[in-house]
UniProtKB/Swiss-Prot annotation:
The gene is rpmE. This is Large ribosomal subunit protein bL31. The keyword Ribonucleoprotein applies. Zn(2+) binds at C16, C18, C38, C41. One of its GO terms (biological process) is translation. It comes from Beutenbergia cavernae (strain ATCC BAA-8 / DSM 12333 / CCUG 43141 / JCM 11478 / NBRC 16432 / NCIMB 13614 / HKI 0122). Part of the 50S ribosomal subunit.
Length: 72
């Protein structure tokens, strides 16, 4: 590698708004990164993910316009 063209790679502490912290390496000069979400509080990783109710939308459409009848 060429010297002088790569940024310094330092040990960095990542702090989430939930209070969770972990250590990694980064080019952030301050050695501190503040994150809004992490794997400890993100709904996808915690299992508290909300699934949209698309079936309710179909039922509402059918109630409004009626269910289609086959044309035989």
């Amino acid at each position: 590698m060429k010297s002088g063209i790569h940024p310094t790679y330092v040990t960095t502490t990542v702090t989430c708004t939930c209070g969770s912290t972990f250590t990694t390496r980064s080019t952030a000069a301050s050695g501190q990164i503040h994150a809004d979400v992490c794997s400890a509080c993100h709904p996808f990783y915690t299992g508290k993910q909300k699934i949209l109710d698309t079936g309710g939308r179909v039922a509402r459409f059918e109630a409004r316009y009626g269910k289609r009848t086959p044309a035989n």
